[in-house]
Curated annotation (Swiss-Prot):
Subunit structure: Part of the 30S ribosomal subunit.
Top-level taxon of origin: Bacteria
Lineage, broadest ranks: Bacteria, Pseudomonadati, Pseudomonadota, Betaproteobacteria, Burkholderiales
Annotated InterPro entries: Ribosomal_uS10, Ribosomal_uS10_CS, Ribosomal_uS10_dom, Ribosomal_uS10_dom_sf
UniProt keyword list: Ribonucleoprotein, Ribosomal protein
One cellular component (GO) term of this entry: ribonucleoprotein complex
Protein name per UniProt: Small ribosomal subunit protein uS10
PROSITE patterns found in the cross-reference section: RIBOSOMAL_S10
Record's keyword annotation contains Ribosomal protein: yes
Amino acid sequence: MQNQKIRIRLKAFDYRLIDQSAAEIVDTAKRTGAIVKGPVPLPTRIQRFDILRSPHVNKTSRDQFEIRTHQRLMDIVDPTDKTVDALMKLDLPAGVDVEIKV
């Protein structure tokens, strides 16, 4: 797999999980002889929701909730076959979404 690049994008609601997963991926890739660029923190996406506190009156009284989606991006330059096999066998936590582009 010469002159190729693997781009890995991680998404999670908990920043501790995403940092731990990124560290595992970087460690695995470096151990198998690949060059890793990143992890680069991408902007956190914040979704806010306004909910009425009362079912009947008091329209001005509201609760605000938010969901924060943290993202990390990393590139693996010139991956070897061992790198790809090791990344496929890697077990990441359930709360982390992984997108891989070759």
